[in-house]
């Protein structure tokens, strides 16, 4: 499966990923398990990573494959190096649900698209479980196929609720390779938020061979 395949990525790619670990913008020294150099006990700072994935009907199998590859890299990246990082998996159609790792990567689900539902659930979980003493990070993958009031409402919620409580937020928008205009209304709304913030980054991807470079660019 995808996780097993990712585990067998070339040694060069894995070594490069690990070499960049200490330059990753969203995990600085306070997120790392303290390495005692002076024999004085120090607290272990805690970090949580929210993984949000669109699994609606507009996300065809190719797009879902791209999203799963992105999150598999993220999963391996964090679990290989940071045992103290909690991972929260949220998938959404027109409603959102928290699921385990296996369901997130493997279960099939489809429906309409309400991006806001995933952001709202992420914030609810953050407030209930990770309100104090946690460094919060999030990564979202979607084709941006949201309509009506959802893009603007989602961007407003991101700006007003999630970003103030988040150290680093990334958005990956997926499109078919032959798509001429890769940017959705959701992208346009998010872009305005990202430009005004210092902790939000956005990228596009259309092919499998773009996922690793995009991931590396986001987390270098």
Write out the residue ranges for each language-model feature.
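Von Willebrand factor
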Residues: 103-136
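Von Willebrand factor type A / integrin I
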Residues: 157-220
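Phosphate/oxyanion-binding active-site loops and adjacent basic polyanion-contact surfaces
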Residues: 26-28, 63-67, 111-119, 150, ...
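Surface-exposed acidic, glycine-flexible loop patches that form ligand/cofactor-binding
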Residues: 40-42, 80-81, 127-133, 160
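DG-centered beta-turn motif at the end of beta-strands
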Residues: 51-56, 135-150, 174
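…and closely analogous acidic/polar surface helices at protein-protein or active-site interfaces
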Residues: 46-47, 57-89
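Acidic, polar low-complexity linker/tail segments
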Residues: 1-50, 59-61, 83
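Short acidic/His/Gly/Ser-rich catalytic and metal-binding motifs that mark active-site loops
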Residues: 96-101
């Amino acid at each position: 499966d995808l996780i097993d395949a990712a585990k067998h990525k070339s040694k060069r790619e894995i070594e490069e990923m690990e070499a960049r670990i200490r330059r990753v913008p969203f995990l600085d020294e306070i997120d790392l398990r303290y390495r005692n150099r002076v024999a004085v006990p120090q607290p272990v700072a805690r970090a949580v990573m929210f993984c949000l994935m669109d699994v609606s009907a507009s996300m065809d199998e190719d797009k879902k494959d791209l999203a799963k590859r992105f999150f598999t890299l993220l999963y391996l990246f964090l679990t290989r190096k940071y045992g103290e990082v909690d991972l929260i998996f949220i998938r959404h159609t027109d409603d959102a649900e928290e699921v385990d790792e296996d369901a997130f990567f493997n279960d099939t689900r489809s429906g309409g698209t309400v991006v806001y539902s995933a952001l709202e659930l992420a914030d609810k979980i953050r407030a209930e479980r990770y309100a104090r003493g946690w460094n919060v990070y999030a990564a979202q993958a979607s084709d941006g196929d949201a309509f009506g009031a959802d893009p603007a409402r989602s961007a407003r919620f991101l700006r007003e609720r999630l970003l103030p409580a988040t150290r680093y937020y990334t958005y990956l928008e997926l499109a078919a390779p032959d798509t001429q205009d890769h940017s959705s209304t959701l992208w346009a709304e998010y872009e305005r938020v990202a430009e005004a913030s210092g902790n939000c980054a956005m990228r596009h991807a259309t092919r499998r061979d773009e996922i690793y470079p995009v991931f590396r660019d986001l987390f270098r």
